[in-house]
Amino acid sequence: METEKMVAEKWLIAIGASGAAGLRDIGALLSTLPADLDAAVLVVLHRPSDKPSFLREVLARRSRMPVFIAEQSEILRPGRAYIGEPAAHLSLFRTNVSALITHDASTHRNRTVDLLFESLANIGGEKIIGVVLSGSLDDGSRGLASIHKANGHTMALEPDREHAQYVGMPENAIRFNGPVDFIGSVATIADEIVKLVSTRANVAIEAV
């Protein structure tokens, strides 16, 4: 049986985006990350809460790792991607990182990415990664800064000037108070994630 300490030592990757462009980016990222990545991936995408959602099915067709709808108090497993229902946002218990919980999002409209990122920041440490992909407005900026302050790793998509309506989220994250560690394309972000996770894993093995 996994203890809280064992789960806390695992990598957690949180990805936030919005709209069709954000969905495209998330699909591209999950299609690049390896199936055996030693990290749990949490995904938040702004989308209507009053319409049927096929996000899991859409992402599962592209993802190399299995995609699940997050359940209340679910233990996070590496090599899996988790999404929330449209009318909820995802966060983690500060005192028990093994539990994934959902909240009513009605009072947190357009702040679901910040809420997820900030819950990871409450855990803190070098094994948390926050990623902001395409989307409008500025959700994710504050949360990404919180992850940076908590010694986690922060990444943002390089804003695409040809699609200016979709650059708000990454552009605001880059400009916000709290430097972004890595800025690049979806492909280079995937490479950086794999490098971070594998490098830290090798260091841990050598230290044993």
List the model feature ranges, each with a label.
Residues 1-208:
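Conserved acid/base catalytic micro-environments in cytosolic active-site loops
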